[in-house]
Amino acid sequence: MYERGYSRLAVTGDSAGGNLALGLIKHLSQSSELAGSALAGGVAVSPVTDLTLSGESWATRGDADPLFTRAQVTDLVQAYLAGHAADDPAASPLFAELKGLAAFRVHVGSDEVLLSDSIRFVEKAFAAGVDARLEVWEGMIHGFLVSVGRLEGSNGGLHRLGEFLRERFVR
């Protein structure tokens, strides 16, 4: 897109797409041909940041999040990794070097199993000097943003996501 004349790009993704979005943000932020200026920022919603599935909320939120179970995710992770290590930074953004990333926001539900992964990822990025912020939506489970118009947290999350991207594009 940048080669076609677009001067500002944003990257967003939800769930596994959040994992891919964070990986792409890392790649674009460190790309010498983009010189860092083309990437306006990014948003990851309920991202899978740790494919080792070692975050504490897998245990503490498992019963509260019926849409995203450990058994279900374990099978998907194994298929995605295809024999590669779960802690490979190319697959698990939590284990990557995060210094120099473009500004991003992470939105996650307070009742989802990926809560601790999101917290750890944003804390690590912030410690590396990245403009990274976490928004935790009370009572929301995995995939809550797809319920826009039905859940207040979904409406608020989409609004905040849009605010951040508008702010980044105005610069």
What do these predicted regions represent?
Residues M1-R171:
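Alpha/beta-hydrolase superfamily serine-hydrolase fold, recognizing
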